[in-house]
Amino acid sequence: MEHCTKKPGGDKEIPAYTADAIETRMRERIRETIQALVEEELEAVLGAEKSARVGEARQGYRHGARERTLTTSLGPTTIAMPRARLRGAAGATTEWRSETVRRYQRRTTRVDEAILGVYLAGTNTRRIKGALAPLLRGGPLSKDAVSRLVGRLRIQ
């Protein structure tokens, strides 16, 4: 019996030992690694592991998770970003913000560098998405996002 796996985004099965299967597993490992880093960061801030009862040592509480699509160098990856409320000194609560995956971050630094490299090579903002289609693999990229990225480059 031949080993098969389902291709992400479709019901078509592909052989488990092909280049597509390798990329699929790598994307899965990237997703797991990003989620583990975010969980570690949140546990450090809260002072407790998920579902742990530690009493006064806890600095806040979890309250669900939301999906976020992050475009990595292997294509788009959907991660579950945990949410938490942090207790302040005066008893006020604030929403936790991850330092690992920033609030409006949609691409990794390597993807941003690739976008800037294509732009600096002379490609106009509308054609960059087509030029980087193999890298982005359907990940979102608008001409406005490219313009904002170039604007940040000009400021630096």
What are these regions (language model features)?
Residues I30, L120, R137-G138:
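Amphipathic alpha-helical interaction elements
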Residues A44-Q59, I155-Q156:
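Active-site phosphate-binding and catalytic loops of NTP-dependent enzymes
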Residues R148-Q156:
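Short, basic alpha-helical nucleic acid-contact segments in DNA-binding proteins
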Residues M1-E40, A44, R107:
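Residue-centric detector for conserved, function-critical "anchor" positions
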Residues R126-G138:
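DNA-recognition alpha helix
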Residues K12-A19, G60-Y119, L141-K143, G151:
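Basic, short loop/linker segments at the boundary and entry of helix-turn-helix/winged-helix-like folds
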Residues V38, I115, I128, V146:
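Residue-level signature of catalytic and energy-coupling elements of molecular machines
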